[in-house]
C-alpha cells in the first residue's frame, strides 16, 4: 500500500537498514497504523477466530516491548480519497471474482481426490478453501470494518492500549503527526508499525533516527535531506494515496543510480531528476506543475491537505514540458525563430569578450537567409567569436541538435518546447558554453 517502491528505494539509498528484531526489546512507546497491520494479518489466516487470536497476540507482544501501544484507527469518510476508493473497489471486485473462480475449482477438485495420501491431500486443499472463503468475506469493506471493531473491543479496558480514532484523516498521517509531538516531548520517536509506505514519506521530513516495523521486518531509518527529496520524488512519480503519479514514468531500484538527487524539492531539480532519458512532447496539454509540487510538499510535511482538491494525473511528458514552458517562453521572447540557425545563434549569444572589426566581417559573411543548412564549422566559429567554447565546457549555455537551438539546465539536459535530450545521450549535440 502507499507509495510504490519507496521502501526498496530507501534501502537502496542506504538510509533504511534492516535490523534483527530480537535485539531490540524495549521502545519508548509504540504507534500502530491499525488497518494496514490488520489487513496484513488477515491475509495470513483462515477465519475470524484465528484473526482475532493472532492480532491480539501481536498487540500484547508490542505492549511487552513498548510499555504502551497506541492503535491509530481510520474512521469516517475522506472526501479527497474518492478516486482512490473507486479504483480500489474496482480492483477488489476483480480480485474477488478471481478468488471465487479459484474457490469453485478447489471445491470441485477436492471431491475427486482418492487413493494414496487422500486424507493429507484433502486436508491441505481444505485449508486453501478456508483461506479463500475468508479472503472473499474480507473483500467486502463493511465486513473488514465490522470484524476490526469487534476485535478492538478486547482492548477497551486495557490501560496499556490506547484506541486513537482518526476522523476523516488517514491513520498513518495522524500517527506520524502524533509521533512528531511525542518526539518533541521525549526526544525520541516511538516505534512505528505500519505496512503503508506513505509512512516512510512522513518519517523522512526530519533527520532524527526512527524505528519502523511491519509484520516481519524491523528497520532503522535515518533520513537525510536527499532521502526526503527521494521520498517526495517517488510520491510524485510513482503516486501516493492522493496523487496517481506521472503516467509513463516509474522510479525503481534499477534506475535509481541514473537519477540525480537534491536537497530541495524544486521544479528545476525535479525535471533534472526526471531527465534520465529523452522525451518528446506528445500533446499541447499543459498542467499546473506548481500546484502538483505544492501538494506533494504539503502532504509529505504533514500539512492538512484534506481540504485540498488533489491534482489530476498527467503524463511525465506533460509534467516536464509544462515545467519548462516558462523558461523556454522567456527565452523565446528574445529569440529569432524564423531565420537560419547561424543567425539565431548570433542573436541569442551574449558576447563574453570584445568583438573586433575583422570578426564582425566574419560574422557578416555567415548571414545567408537563403541557406537553411548549418555548417558545423560556422557554428563553432560564431561561438568562438562570441567568447564561447564547444569542448570541455564547465557551463553549457546552448546545445545545437539537427538545426535546433536548445537551452541547457544544470549541464544535465537540453530542451526546447518540443524535446528534451539528456546529457547521457548527447553524442550528436554541439555544446556552446564556457
Curated annotation (Swiss-Prot):
Belongs to the XPG/RAD2 endonuclease family. FEN1 subfamily. It comes from the Viruses. Binds 2 magnesium ions per subunit. They probably participate in the reaction catalyzed by the enzyme. Its cofactor is Mg(2+). This is Putative nuclease OPG089. It is found in: Virion. Putative nuclease that seems to be required for double-strand break repair, homologous recombination, and production of full-length viral genomic DNA. One of its GO terms (cellular component) is virion component. GO terms for molecular function: metal ion binding; nuclease activity. Mg(2+) 2 binds at residues 196, 198. It comes from Vaccinia virus (strain Copenhagen). Keywords: DNA damage, DNA repair, Early protein, Hydrolase, Magnesium, Metal-binding, Nuclease, Virion. Mg(2+) 1 binds at residues 33, 74, 168, 170. InterPro entries: Poxvirus_G5. Induction: Expressed in the early phase of the viral replicative cycle. Its EC number is 3.1.-.-. GO terms for biological process: DNA repair. Its main location: virion. It is an enzyme of class 3 (hydrolase).
Amino acid at each position: 500500500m502507499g507509495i510504490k517502491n519507496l521502501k526498496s528505494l530507501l534501502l537502496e539509498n542506504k538510509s533504511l537498514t534492516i535490523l534483527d528484531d530480537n535485539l531490540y526489546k524495549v521502545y519508548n512507546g509504540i504507534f500502530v497504523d491499525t488497518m494496514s497491520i490488520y489487513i496484513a494479518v488477515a491475509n495470513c489466516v483462515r477465519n475470524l477466530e484465528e484473526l482475532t487470536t493472532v492480532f491480539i497476540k501481536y498487540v500484547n507482544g508490542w505492549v511487552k516491548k513498548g510499555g504502551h501501544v497506541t492503535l491509530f484507527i481510520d474512521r469516517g469518510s475522506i472526501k479527497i480519497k474518492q478516486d482512490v476508493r473507486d479504483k480500489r473497489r474496482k480492483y477488489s471486485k476483480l480480485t474477488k471474482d478471481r478468488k471465487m473462480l479459484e474457490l469453485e475449482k478447489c471445491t470441485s477438485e477436492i471431491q475427486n481426490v482418492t487413493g494414496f495420501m487422500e486424507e493429507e491431500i484433502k486436508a491441505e486443499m481444505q485449508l486453501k478453501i478456508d483461506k479463500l472463503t475468508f479472503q472473499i468475506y474480507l473483500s467486502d469493506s463493511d465486513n473488514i470494518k465490522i470484524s476490526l471493531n469487534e476485535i478492538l473491543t478486547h482492548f477497551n479496558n486495557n490501560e496499556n492500549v490506547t484506541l486513537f480514532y482518526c476522523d476523516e484523516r488517514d491513520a498513518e498521517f495522524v500517527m506520524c503527526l502524533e509521533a512528531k509531538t511525542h518526539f518533541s516531548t521525549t526526544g525520541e520517536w516511538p516505534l512505528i508499525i505500519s505496512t503503508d509506505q506513505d509512512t516512510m514519506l512522513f518519517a523522512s521530513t526530519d533527520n532524527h533516527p526512527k524505528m519502523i516495523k511491519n509484520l516481519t521486518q524491523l528497520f532503522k531509518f535515518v533520513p537525510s535531506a536527499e532521502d526526503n527529496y527521494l521520498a517526495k520524488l517517488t510520491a510524485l512519480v510513482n503516486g501516493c494515496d492522493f496523487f496517481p503519479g506521472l503516467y509513463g514514468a516509474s522510479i525503481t531500484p534499477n534506475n535509481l543510480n541514473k537519477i540525480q538527487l537534491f536537497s530541495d524539492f524544486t521544479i528545476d531539480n525535479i525535471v533534472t531528476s526526471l531527465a534520465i532519458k529523452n522525451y518528446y512532447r506528445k500533446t499541447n496539454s499543459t498542467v499546473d506543475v506548481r500546484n502538483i509540487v505544492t501538494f506533494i510538499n504539503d502532504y509529505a510535511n504533514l500539512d492538512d491537505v484534506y481540504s485540498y482538491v488533489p491534482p489530476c494525473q498527467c503524463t511525465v511528458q506533460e509534467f516536464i514540458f509544462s515545467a519548462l514552458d516558462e523558461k523556454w517562453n522567456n527565452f523565446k521572447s528574445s529569440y529569432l525563430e524564423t531565420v537560419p540557425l547561424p543567425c539565431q545563434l548570433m542573436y541569442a549569444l551574449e558576447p563574453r569578450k570584445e568583438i573586433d572589426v575583422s570578426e564582425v566581417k566574419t560574422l557578416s559573411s555567415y548571414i545567408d537567409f537563403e541557406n537553411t543548412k548549418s555548417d558545423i564549422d560556422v557554428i563553432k566559429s560564431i561561438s568562438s567569436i562570441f567568447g564561447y567554447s564547444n569542448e570541455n565546457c564547465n557551463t553549457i549555455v546552448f546545445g545545437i541538435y539537427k538545426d535546433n537551438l536548445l537551452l541547457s539546465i544544470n549541464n544535465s539536459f537540453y530542451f526546447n518546447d518540443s524535446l528534451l535530450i539528456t546529457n547521457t545521450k548527447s553524442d550528436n549535440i554541439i555544446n556552446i558554453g564556457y
